[in-house]
């Protein structure tokens, strides 16, 4: 009996048992928290999907009602409306040849059709019908009656004065934690668009966190290229590129911090323009990297032709925008510079020494150069403004998403997973890999952190400008990433954005003009593509662009800071010469 009591009451606890029990309890708690997080994320995503589906259904119903009550607007009229350039459309709206109602419903119907095929829209802005009813009060606006699509991260708030109902639409940037955080006000650009008579009518898809030039996220899914469903529409303004390239919008607003307007424009065969940072207001546009100042984002227009981009810039650069955002320099659009016919002194380079252009890119560039020379412009070959570049150091969001990989706080889109895996590795593993991968470093250009800091310094910008002045250049013609990549390859090929990212670093205005399409000969030549180094990234790039016959190919036009109108004028010259050729 004494032995029994000693066993029950006198036995000392075994610390191994206690520690094991504690560990099991902690593990169970972690699993429970992960499960709860999964459920919360899933519920948020489902709610967003239901909201989107309802908006699409209501838009479909409204279009059907309009068509039934307006039988005179037949398919021929709709086709005519959709074929007009922005300038022609605006003119016919102004003179009464077309009504805003007919134009709006024609584009809404086309948008719904394109979205079914490409999954490019995140939400129809149903309040656009209310704006349509009151549109005649803005008949003096430069964009009177024009439907405009906007990127998902651009703020849009709704106010119904009759019932005092005020609410905003989400600007998630494709990230679950930003769901159910509606905009508290219109972005400045949305306010100016409305003042100029434009009707924002749909929001378009983006990659998760705006951190890829693919276009997919766990909330709204993957967007497809309008010319080939196996290819990406680009990013991060990929929904805009797909919708405009598919004919569902005549004008869109995107944002660009590394090529996010220019890459989708190139991949989808449209024109896109990244203005000098702070030429257009960023107020009200959502971002996932707050406080980031080293590389500035720009909002800018995307459209089917360069004149549409210029008209949009002209409309936005007005007193109303400068009043709403007094931090901007009040520089109105210079129509005289845009319409100038003075011969240009054009710089040209075909290879930045880092990412060799594909055969179709190189051919398109050489053909454009020849056309410009034939038209009387002077083309010279200065050094490329960059011979090396490294990954974006702004890792706040990437690190946050890498935590999601470990802790399952929310799903990471396949478009981005490969890109963020290295950040989720333990520090010890990273150190081991850095030793093992040292030989690979010598295969490509030696990129040091000091070089990155140098690129960001003002000295570097002034050196490039000094070289530009020494060569007496007006503008620059250079390669544009393309043709469109196969889905999920962009995450593995962030190195190829050197051609676009450098002009964000330098804060130079830059735009994209489609000039050709991939030919069978280009595809044959691609079979022998080795790149600059013949390394793993060159091989990946070759795979990414394979199967691109018929896809659009673009060139990039660049000017010095604050010479946006000159850049657009150069883009129009390129567009005109290439159109005449074909």
Language-model features, listed with the residues they occupy:
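Short, compositionally biased segments
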Residues: 153-166, 209, 322-324, 388-399, ...
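Short, surface-exposed loop/helix-turn segments at secondary-structure junctions
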Residues: 174, 483-500, 520-540
């Amino acid at each position: 009996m004494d032995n029994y009591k000693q066993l029950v009451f006198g036995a000392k606890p075994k610390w191994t048992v206690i520690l094991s029990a504690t560990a099991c309890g902690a593990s169970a708690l972690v699993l429970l928290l992960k499960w709860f997080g999964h459920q919360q994320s899933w519920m948020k995503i489902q709610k967003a999907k239901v909201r989107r589906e309802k908006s699409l259904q209501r838009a479909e119903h409204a279009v059907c009602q309009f068509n039934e009550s307006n039988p005179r607007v037949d398919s021929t009229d709709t086709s005519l409306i959709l074929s007009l350039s922005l300038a022609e459309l605006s003119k016919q709206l102004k003179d009464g040849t077309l009504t805003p109602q007919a134009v709006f419903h024609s584009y809404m119907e086309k948008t719904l059709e394109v979205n079914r095929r490409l999954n490019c829209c995140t939400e129809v802005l149903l309040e656009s019908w209310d704006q349509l009813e009151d549109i005649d009060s803005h008949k003096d606006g430069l964009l009177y009656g024009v439907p405009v699509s906007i990127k998902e991260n651009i703020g849009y708030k709704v106010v119904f004065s009759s019932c005092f109902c005020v609410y905003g639409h989400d600007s998630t940037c494709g990230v679950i934690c930003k769901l159910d955080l509606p905009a508290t006000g219109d972005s400045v650009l949305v306010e100016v668009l409305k003042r100029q008579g434009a009707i924002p009518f749909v929001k378009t898809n983006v990659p998760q966190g705006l951190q890829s030039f693919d276009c997919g996220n766990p909330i709204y899914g993957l967007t497809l290229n309008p010319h080939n469903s196996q290819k990406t529409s680009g990013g991060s303004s990929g929904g805009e590129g797909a919708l405009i390239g598919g004919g569902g919008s005549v004008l869109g607003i995107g944002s660009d911090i590394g090529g996010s307007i220019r890459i989708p424009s190139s991949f989808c065969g449209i024109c896109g323009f990244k203005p000098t940072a702070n030429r257009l207001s960023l107020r009200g546009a959502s971002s996932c990297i707050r406080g980031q100042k080293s590389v500035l984002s720009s909002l800018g227009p995307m459209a089917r032709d360069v004149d549409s981009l210029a008209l949009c810039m002209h409309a936005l650069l007005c007193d109303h925008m400068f009043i709403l955002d007094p931090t901007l320099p009040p520089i109105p659009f210079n129509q005289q510079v845009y319409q100038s016919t003075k011969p240009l002194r054009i710089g040209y380079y075909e290879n930045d020494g880092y990412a060799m252009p594909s055969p179709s890119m190189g051919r398109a560039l050489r053909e454009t150069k020849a056309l410009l020379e034939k038209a009387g412009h002077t083309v010279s070959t200065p050094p490329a403004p960059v011979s090396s570049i490294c990954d974006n150091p702004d890792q706040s969001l990437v690190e946050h998403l890498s935590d999601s990989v470990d802790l399952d706080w929310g799903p990471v889109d396949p478009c981005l997973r490969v890109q963020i895996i290295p950040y989720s590795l333990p520090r010890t593993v990273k150190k081991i890999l850095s030793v093992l991968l040292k030989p690979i470093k010598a295969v490509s250009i030696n990129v040091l952190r000091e070089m990155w800091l140098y690129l960001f310094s003002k000295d570097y910008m002034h050196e490039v400008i000094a070289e530009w002045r020494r060569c007496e250049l007006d503008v620059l013609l250079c390669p544009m990433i393309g043709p469109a990549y196969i889905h999920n390859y962009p995450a593995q090929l962030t190195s190829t954005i050197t051609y676009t990212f450098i002009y964000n670093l330098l804060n130079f205005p830059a735009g994209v003009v489609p000039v050709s399409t991939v030919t069978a000969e280009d595809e044959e030549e691609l079979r022998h593509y080795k790149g600059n180094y013949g390394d793993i990234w060159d091989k990946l790039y070759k795979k990414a662009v394979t199967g691109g016959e018929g896809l659009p190919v673009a060139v990039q036009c660049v000017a010095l800071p604050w010479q946006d109108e000159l850049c657009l004028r150069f883009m129009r010259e390129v567009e005109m010469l290439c159109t005449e050729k074909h």
